[in-house]
Structures are given as C-alpha cells and as structure tokens.
Amino acid sequence: MPRKRQSTKARIVKSAWNLFYKNGYEQTTVEEIIAASKTSKGTFYHYFKGKEALLNSLSYLFDEKYEELVPLIDDNMSCRDKLLYLNHELFDMIEHSIDIKLLASLYSSQLVTKDKKSLSDKKRFYFQWITEIIEAGLESGEFKNSSSAGELMNIYAMYERALLYDWALFKGKYSLTEYSDRLLPHVLDMFEKGV
C-alpha cells in the first residue's frame, strides 16, 4: 500500500493531539494548534468547528500511525505476525502519547453522537489495510475460511475497541501494549482454526 502525503487535516489533528498530550486538552488553545500545524485560522475552521470537534478526530491519528508503518512491514511476514506487529505498534503509541481522559471522551462521544462515528468508519485506512491483510490470510489458507474477511475484520476491530475501552475504564492501571501482546494471539488462533 503506498504511503500517502500527510494532508492538511491530518497535520492539524496530529499537532492538536500532541499538544493535548503535552499541555492537556483544556490548556491547549486553537491558536496553539494553528501555530503548531502551520495552518491558518480559516483552514482550521474549514476542517473543524472548534477544538471540541477534534475529540472525534483521534481515529485519524490512529490511521496516520498505520500509514507510517506501511513501509516497515515485511511482505514475507505471516498475516498473523503483521496483525500482531500493527496492534503492538498502535497500542504502544496510544499508551505513551494519548491522554487517557481524551481517549475516554472519544469513546463516550462515539456512543451518543448523531454525527459520523469515526471509530466505525469503514472508509478509514485502518479498516482497508487490516481487511487486505485478513483477505491475504484467507487466500493463502493461513486463516480458515469459515468466516468472511469482513466478519474477521469486525472481530479484530471489536477486540481492539474493547481493550481500549477497558484500559480507559481502569485509567491505564496496566500496560495496554503488554496486555494486548498476551491476548491478541488467542484471538488470531481463532482466525487460524475457524470462527
């Protein structure tokens, strides 16, 4: 999958979340986000109604991380190992650079919003790339084809959302990355044996 050039919207999102982590959400101003992202006020408001709208943008930051990982994935890795690697890298980034209160806010807002639910948007890079990996696993016979790629993608995404929710619920009292490193292999065992 080719690496995409970082869009203006993605640059704003990444800058905002870096500032939220460093300074806290409440202490970060729109002006600081504009300066850090090297954009104009008009450009910022073209993409976002205000700072609050950025809470729903965390999934874009996740996609940015995945796009950074594209060139690092060895095509010779098994599909299982690709999924383990991607999950480890994403959760490590979340654990060490995302304010857990903001993650909790994102999850709660996704349950009540009437707007687009970014965490379940199938057009996201995340869903497309993980589905491609799962399809390759099904085609090669690495994953048993008793379920479709879409069904396995739903299970994988549900696993990640559940673990992130639990980690936020318990206020990060355990290592998200280490816990997932122990649990995800069991989920992928099901992919190999059949669901």
Tell where the protein language model's regions lie, with residue ranges.
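Alpha-helical DNA-contacting segments of helix-turn-helix folds
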Residues: 48, 55-62
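Hydrophobic alpha-helical connector segments
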Residues: 57, 71-97, 149-156, 177
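C-terminal peripheral helix-coil segments that are non-catalytic and often amphipathic
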Residues: 85, 89-92, 128, 132-140, ...
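Short secondary-structure transition hinges
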Residues: 91-131, 142
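All-alpha amphipathic helical-bundle segments outside canonical DNA-binding/catalytic cores
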Residues: 118-123, 139-155, 178
